[in-house]
Amino acid sequence: MSWDDAIDGVDRDTPGGRMPRAWNVAARLRAANDDIVHAQQADGLPAYAELHCLSDFSFLRGASSAEQLFARAQQCGYSALAITDECSLAGIVRGLEASRATGVRLIVGSEFTLVDGTRFVLLVENAHGYPQLCGLITTARRAASKGAYRLDRAEVQAQFRDVAPGVFALWLPGAQPQAEQGAWLQQVFGERAFLAVELHREQDDVARLHVLQALAQQLGMTALASGDVHMAQRRERIVQDTLTAIRHTLPLAECGAHLFRNGERHLRTRRALGNIYPDALLQATVELAQRCTFDISKISYTYPRELVPEGHTPTSYLRQLTEAGIRRRWPGGITAKVREDIEKELALIALKKYEAFFLTVQDVVRFAREQNILCQGRGSSANSAVCYALGITAVNPDETRLLMARFLSEKRDEPPDIDVDFEHERREEVLQYVYSKYGRERAALAATVICYRGKSAVRDVAKAFGLPPDQIALLANCYGWGNGETPMDQRIEEAGFDLANPLINKILAVTEHLRDHPRHLSQHVGGFVISDEPLSLLVPVENAAMANRTIIQWDKDDLETMKLLKVDCLALGMLTCIRKTLDLVRGHRGRNYSIATLPGGDAPTYKMIQRADTVGVFQIESRAQMAMLPRLKPAAFYDLVIEVAIVRPGPIQGDMVHPYLRRRQGREEVNYPSPAVEDILKPTLGVPLFQEQVMELLMHAADYSEDEADNLRRSMAAWRRGGDMEQHRTRVRERMQGKGYASSFIDQIFEQIKGFGSYGFPQSHAASFAKLVYASCWLKRHEPAAFACGLLNAQPMGFYSASQIVQDARRGSPERERVEVLPVDVLHSDWDNTLVGGRPWRSAADPGEQPAIRLGMRQVAGLSQVVAQRIVAARTQRAFADIGDLCLRAALDEKARLALAEAGALQGMVGNRNAARWAMAGVEARCPLLPGSPEERPVEFEAPRAGEEILADYRSVGLSLRQHPMALLRPQMRQRRILGLRELQGRRHGSGVHVAGLVTQRQRPATAKGTIFVTLEDEQGMINVIVWSHLALRRRRALLESRLLAVRGRWERVDGVEHLIAGDLYDLSNLLGDMQLPSRDFH
């Protein structure tokens, strides 16, 4: 059924047409350009420019994207289109891109409603007006909380006082026009103030037209036509109505006057406009549009220059810092190749005038290092020899094959991308340094556009259509889980919905339309934009949700289009873990290391990695990575670079993984069609695993220039989003055939290139991450107690819960020592987990003894750091005499007392949990007494049973140092003939087994075609279970909801990789009672 069928009931030409009789729309909306009624282009139709139009960046108001609006404007023959989102320029860059694509001229503007109700639109006339508009939006947004704005007349007048306005103002009179509002606008903007006549085929249109024309004449203002456009086409009215209901948090049936009376707020044909407005009002729109000559693509931008000391230019100062870095990084001197790379890069940086950008990033990194905040550059910037010399990145050009064009290119007219990771717990210090260094008027975070996805859209839409909460949840679950092999209609019917029901039909249709529709702005994870001038002259700035944060209204793609430079200050939990671990090793073990000085090429570390003993380490801790490690068997640093990169969608979909492994294992011969190809692909055995290899391959085998190769690399990402790669296939084929390469090799290489469209790593990025992989693995192998302790203190982060980290540390392995873990105790614990006992490291021959970990009070649920610090401070002064003394001197409230009792943290003072609960219950009566006063004879309490203790441990601390829950259930498991996981070691490949365990992880990789990977844990270890899509659908509830899952299946053991192929699943969670266990699902 077409979208047009949905509006058959609308009285299109009758004034006051209210609602369609039936919204019987298809389950999917067509693309925006389908079935558009093309405007007649015959002579005699009036020219028109739409000057008041909201895009979907007027959140929950505008129903159409800029692309849809400009396509419609082009088809209707408009001379120009103004995007006037409410107090926002968030969608204007998309408007610029759509304008370029269609040839319809863009006018920059914004709509405002003052606190007194006055409504108007400002349109930018020239380069003077644009910063005025940005400044006004910034003023309004900074005066309110995130997502809102506040503006009054005084602030408008202040913005334009003593300056010639570079904007035009369109007054938007209300239903009962108040001449005073128009007179005020005229007072502020003079002859630049216009009266917008907006007619929408309502009963009073004729009378309203006469009233507004008379009012314009009375005020001496020019009247012009305007559409108050909220959608590209009438057919999108159902979407606009739904957005209105969502915005007002009301069901559609109760929205009443909040909804527009009809669907006329769309881009109407010029014939329709000619039938509504007098010619003079239409002509006035064109004349005003012609006066708006501002081109937003021409805005100028200068990076901060105050970092350049007197007597230097940006070029000379960058050179000085680079040369100093060269002496520090290469004390014995650099190779001729590295010198050549640095000189070439410095020349290109100067040509592109990026010196100030590099100086700014270097300054941020310098600050972090001075504050002992670990940081490291990543991404394509690790291809930069200059970044390495400046200390921004950690990848030595001598160690890896760098390709500068991946990072910086003469022909690529976009800024370089420098990403720097900082400790996640201390990154805020870095962000606040940037704010303090440059001021909030010159530094702000980039925005991220939060868009509807299927699940969030259907929730909001179904609620707007009045579905009850239980049905909304059922419908949302259809979007939240499933695989592409199962049609959505089938999932919805299986959930109990009737697709013949018109209401369900409508909900699904609008949901599909709202997929990827902008919902609101959020802040980028760390992308800073810094300017030499106030940012609000370039782009509006508004408040973020977090205190002391401000964001601009453009996202990273907008910044790229507008050629504004962004510094990415990102947060990485593993850096926090490593820094805390190194501090513990230094303080407790006497070994003073940094990431750079850890012993390299350590055989025991690589042996541990090859056994996939990598719980908690960086990057190679996932089950997919663990399954790869015994097959790839990393034995050197470059092997880790490959390991990081190979378990990615790009190499998997490009069929690169298995050929590489076969060649590495000697099962497949490696042949190179030419010496040039061998030089490029030999490190990866003839398989292009990295983006840089693809680019080099094209440059040598297809005579691509650096910039042409980079363009193809960029096309990979565009192809993933629906672009066209075939033009490149033809070009690559012709060029490679011309150089004598066989068609089979060309086709193989091109399919592998296409695989990178599904996300592949640049080698530089993989090498940066591999540095942290090795560091974390070395620490886990040689300092297991410190590493586990640092990992616990850096939570939340990574794949594993505190319980799994502790279980892994206590279990140990053939490659690393077991670690003793001691419980939380108010007599000994600090806030953080700490190391106790052991013997310091003396030498390789005398490594000392591993200390134990004392769990800290940070593990106690419901206990704040402030309370824990009071306990430690009081204990440091003198020992606690009794429970009353503890509560009195540490000022423990009821919540804190209960948390400590439940956590077993009072064991050293009063005994078991039951005794602790009783003791804390009587504290109120005893607190007024002096510490040490005579007390009643203590009551003897029977200790809780083992199961109760374990249950309480998980509830209050999130882990247990007692028996594993599965150990308690082992007798019942034996009765069911369920094996312990250690018993699987003796089973032959392909044998049938029956196991059960606690579910600790569920994963569904995008490349797995619906296959689910589940990790089970018992008292003996962990295993990976593979659940094929057909079983996942059949046993969906057990798979997704079980805490304790039993599996019958086939045990597989190939190339050192062990896993269980599930044949059937069932839920045994009832055996756990109320015990709640953490599981990391689908991350």
Swiss-Prot record:
The keyword Membrane does not apply. GO terms for cellular component: cytoplasm. It comes from the Bacteria. Its EC number is 2.7.7.7. It catalyses: DNA(n) + a 2'-deoxyribonucleoside 5'-triphosphate = DNA(n+1) + diphosphate. Transmembrane segments: none annotated. GO terms for biological process: DNA repair; DNA replication. Gene3D superfamilies: 1.10.150.870, Metal-dependent hydrolases. Signal peptide: none annotated. It is found in: Cytoplasm. It is an enzyme of class 2 (transferase). Keywords: Cytoplasm, DNA damage, DNA repair, DNA replication, DNA-directed DNA polymerase, Nucleotidyltransferase, Transferase. Its main location: cytoplasm. CDD domains: DnaE_OBF, PHP_PolIIIA_DnaE2. HAMAP family: DNApol_error_prone. DNA polymerase involved in damage-induced mutagenesis and translesion synthesis (TLS). It is not the major replicative DNA polymerase. Belongs to the DNA polymerase type-C family. DnaE2 subfamily. This is Error-prone DNA polymerase. The lineage of its organism: Bacteria, Pseudomonadati, Pseudomonadota, Gammaproteobacteria, Lysobacterales.
